From Swiss-Prot:
L-tyrosine binds at Y34, Y165, Q169. It comes from Pediococcus pentosaceus (strain ATCC 25745 / CCUG 21536 / LMG 10740 / 183-1w). This is Tyrosine--tRNA ligase. PROSITE patterns: AA_TRNA_LIGASE_I, S4. It catalyses: tRNA(Tyr) + L-tyrosine + ATP = L-tyrosyl-tRNA(Tyr) + AMP + diphosphate + H(+). One of its GO terms (biological process) is tyrosyl-tRNA aminoacylation. ATP binds at K230. Its main location: cytoplasm. CDD domains: S4, TyrRS_core. One of its GO terms (cellular component) is cytosol. Gene3D superfamilies: HUPs (3.40.50.620), RNA-binding S4 domain (3.10.290.10), Tyrosyl-Transfer RNA Synthetase (1.10.240.10).
């Protein structure tokens, strides 16, 4: 199957500058293509993953992806999809973010048949006079104003800095066409104006016969109409320090039945046959959530590796069953990150006093005794029924944590100082 047909089946194509031309080109040869990301932060989130999943599919089909880190454009800000002016970052921030993004990209794309470039390398060498003389005359202001990317900002105002962003992105495409043999730019739906500005510039400077193309990806919406990419806690990051692999796994595991097949097509490399089989299980046995489980496994493995999948599944099973005593300290950090927690001293104490006075888990000594005697309290996975029992914070989990479960579902974490 042609790569464009494959992307279409997976729901990953929104607009193309020349569908038939691009299909013909990708049938004839392996092409260079690129997508860019500005270093506005030190980690990508799952929304950023969307265009790079498309690039990865091209790479797997033998094509040559180029990742553009926007060290130059990132220092001024892209108005795409923004209702107000971006806050400019210091160059130190930009360079720090560049290095973090590079390390993430290498994890996804490896080092073979893949290039990473930084537009700061060529944009920073261009003088203002060069910019105006060589490129400014080729851009019609009326055309630029008519593009959605700018028109949507005219009422609230847009600075000249952000207004010129589409020119800089066009220069990037031209540079990569001439120096990296790149013929296709990929971006989100809000990048259409910038991408077509780039193909127009190349045709003006290199001739209409230049074979360059643009392809945008649809805005991913969930079945409830909300934009895909965030959890209740905000962005779902690809950096394990910002969103733990367990949280990442749970995000995918909790996807709605109405969305899971779409996400399997988009975010996994499973075959058509396997996805269609999983789609059937959503209809016939939705309670088993096999499709969601496979989605969580595949995407977590791609971003964090197989070991992270096993760890996330171990944490999930322990929390569901209550058998937490076999968890490692690292797994507890992940699984209990968003649960109620309290700092405690590393000293032995009567369980009733510890639950009431030290941790405030129980509201009164009477309630604490009652819960203990009724078997409602578990410490580190073990049921405690003796009101005279002693808590030793250093006895489990490398002396770092005490896990309390009250009732069937209510967990608390005590962090040992």
């Amino acid at each position: 199957m042609n790569i464009i047909d494959e992307l279409t089946w997976r729901g990953a194509v929104n607009q193309q500058t020349d569908e038939e031309g691009l299909k013909k080109l990708t049938d004839e040869k392996k092409i260079g293509l690129y997508a860019g990301i500005d270093p506005t932060g030190d980690s990508m989130h799952i929304g950023h993953l969307i265009p790079f999943m498309v690039l990865k599919r091209f790479q797997q089909a033998g094509h040559k992806p180029v990742i553009l880190i926007g060290g130059g454009t990132g220092s001024i800000g892209d108005p795409s999809g923004k209702k107000s002016e971006r806050v400019l970052q210091t160059m130190e921030q930009v360079h720090h973010n560049e290095e973090a993004l590079k390390s993430q990209m290498v994890k996804f794309f490896g080092t073979d048949n893949f290039r990473m470039v930084n537009n700061y390398d060529w944009l920073s060498k261009m003088s203002l006079l060069d910019f105006l003389r060589d490129y400014g005359k080729l851009f019609n202001v009326n055309t630029m104003l008519a593009k959605d990317i700018v028109a949507s900002r005219l009422e609230v105002g847009i600075s000249f800095t952000e207004f010129t962003y589409q020119i800089l992105q066009s220069i990037d495409f031209l540079h990569l066409y001439k120096n990296e043999d790149v013929q296709l730019q990929i971006g989100g739906g809000d990048q259409w104006g910038n991408i077509t500005a780039g193909t127009d510039l190349i045709h003006r400077m290199e001739g209409q016969e230049a074979k360059v193309y643009g392809l945008t990806i649809p805005l991913l919406l969930k079945a409830d109409g909300t934009k895909f990419g965030k959890s209740e806690g905000g962005n779902v990051w690809l950096d394990a320090e910002k969103t733990t692999p367990y949280e990442f796994y749970q995000f995918w595991l909790n996807q709605d039945d109405r969305d899971v097949v779409k996400f399997l097509k988009y975010f996994t490399f499973l075959s058509h046959e396997e996805i269609e089989r999983l789609a059937e299980t959503v209809k016939t046995a939705p309670e088993k959530r096999e499709a969601q489980r496979r989605l969580a496994e595949e995407v977590t493995s791609f971003v964090h590796g197989d070991a992270a999948v096993e760890e996330a599944q171990h944490i999930s099973a322990a929390l569901f069953s209550g058998e937490v005593k076999d968890l490692t300290a690292s797994e507890i950090e992940q699984g209990f990150k968003n649960m109620p927690s309290v700092d405690v001293e590393n000293k032995k104490e009567n369980i009733v006093l510890w639950l009431v006075d030290t941790t405030k888990i129980e509201s009164s000594r009477r309630q604490a005794r009652e819960d203990i005697q009724n078997g409602a309290i578990r410490i580190n996975g073990e049921k405690v029924t003796d009101v005279n029992a002693e808590i030793d914070p250093a006895s489990n989990f490398d002396g770092k944590f005490v896990i309390v479960r009250r009732g069937k579902k209510k967990y608390f974490l005590a962090r040992v100082k």
